[in-house]
Amino acid sequence: MKMQTLNFTSSLLFLSFIFLSCALLISSQQSPSQPHSEPPSQLPFEPPVESPFFPPSQPPIFVPPSQPPSLPPSQSQSPSLACKSTPYPKLCRTILNAVKSSPSDPYRYGKFTIKQCLKQASRLSKVITSYARRVESKPGSATAEEIGAVADCGELSELSVNYLETVTTELKTAQVMTAALVEHVNSLLSGVVTNQQTCLDGLVEAKSGFAAAIGSPMGNLTRLYSISLGLVSHALNRNLKRFKASKGKILGGGNSTYREPLETLIKGLRKTCDNDKDCRKTSRNLGELGETSGGSILVSKAVIVGPFKSDNFTTITDAIAAAPNNTRPEDGYFVIYAREGVYEEYIVVPINKKNLMLMGDGINKTIITGNHNVVDGWTTYNCSSFAVVGERFMAVDVTFRNTAGPEKHQAVALRNNAEGSSFYRCSFEGYQDTLYVHSLRQFYRECDIYGTVDFIFGNAAAIFQNCNIYARKPMAKQKNAITAHGRLDPNQNTGISIINCTIKAAPDLAAEPKSAMTFLGRPWKPYSRTVFMQSYISDIVQPVGWLEWNGTIGLDTIYYGEYSNFGPGANTNQRVQWLGYNLLNLAEAMNFTVYNFTMGDTWLPQTDIPFYGGLLSKE
């Protein structure tokens, strides 16, 4: 159906102002350079020389961070030299040369472009918000799909402004440049690039007239984001080599918080709040239910969601709304214990709700479910049963489900664009696009993931450890792809790393194994990056292993890898012969561990979720 479009005059005038006022963006539209497919450059710190492995059940030992010296200015660089680290060197030189007092320090180049990014992102966000309001105020002027896509763009543009403000503040106030800070900055800048592309993809899919009006300015702004990412990432990592990186530490808490092992917290809450018993105990009482031994989690408060009079809330949404805003890691987790039951509510953890822990009674006991999908007019970005944006979110013993079915195509169970988020003993159930690992750094441990087409997809830096990945039976003539990573830029620190997992057929596909072909993944975007390491791969996976997305597009620039997998589907003799496909050696594989890929050893200890920083010992 052909869409009706609004009069774009006012929006175009404002967009033209952006386009003209941003002289640094007016340049020839240069395509990204096409580098050879190579292993990722060395990350902030290498695994210990004496042993490349950590024991499977033990995280690294954490010590108080050393205090590196403040960073002296880097050696001067010309714009031409600095811009070699970006995908758009010609446009980059135009940007830096446009400033009369052009800074010569690479770090200042990056900070200058971030300032420009924030200025233009704020303007673009206002344009999108204004247009969204006009669409909503004129019923019938746009389709439901277009309204949804524009709303997504508004949300994503606001997130990008927030990320850029955070980066600006952190770079301005940092006394020392730790490895953890560098990785956090890189993650947020990578997220900005991803947000922009998600907006554009959604507008195009909705056949929105607004896409044509906003496409050129957004394209230029995307290039600016990409240039800033390249400059900042390169400059910070150069400076980082001046001292040894510090490891993470366990943060202390204030008088209103307490520490206890995660398992003790879980058992204590379930025991104390059994059935309809009074759960209105103080945080201190809950904290004294068990003895602390080894790791622990810092808790500020615990609330209960359930049907009993003694429970604090009847919906998870209300419990989230009651959580404090913008808390810090040292403030502790706000714990939401959702009793066994089916929660038919569409839940969003917004960006201001940080340090939330959602705890259930176990897989298939505490269930969050919905059925929104693309066929019924929802966008892929906004059709999830559960969405999380707030930093440091963690979930334990919960099932996230989308019941739309394969005939409804994209139907997301959980969308995650939360920095430093983690999921432990959770289940994600759907068909196409089950788990949307949208952006930023994520960790999944001992989880079950069910789906058909692209059922782990997005552009996060996501690590899966000890998970079960089940391919379901798709619709006729469909092919299963376990992963579809969306890395857009060679400087993004994103990818999917699957370690010590089990890949096999779900019961419906196991009953008819020849009804559909299953592949490890396909490249959603040109720099897609995915590795399978030390995992069991059943014979459900085709001998070629991987599937192209659109002909040969991206096959030379992606980075797909396998390392030390086993099982009947792990034989690599007949694997694809793409330039971007790699059989990894140990050194290359170590780049995709918790220790190196997401620097999880600097933030996962706060969750007390078990993890290993390296690879499994071969002993």
UniProtKB/Swiss-Prot annotation:
Tissue distribution of the protein: Expressed in siliques.
Cellular-component GO terms for this entry: extracellular region
Leader sequence segment: 1-23
Organism: Arabidopsis thaliana
Pathway: Glycan metabolism; pectin degradation; 2-dehydro-3-deoxy-D-gluconate from pectin: step 1/5
Superkingdom: Eukaryota
Underlying gene: PME25
Protein's name in the database: Probable pectinesterase/pectinesterase inhibitor 25
Disulfide links within the chain: 447-467
A Pfam match: PMEI
Region (Disordered): 31-84
Chief localization: secreted
Keyword vocabulary terms for this entry: Aspartyl esterase, Cell wall, Cell wall biogenesis/degradation, Disulfide bond, Glycoprotein, Hydrolase, Secreted, Signal
Transmembrane portions of the chain: none
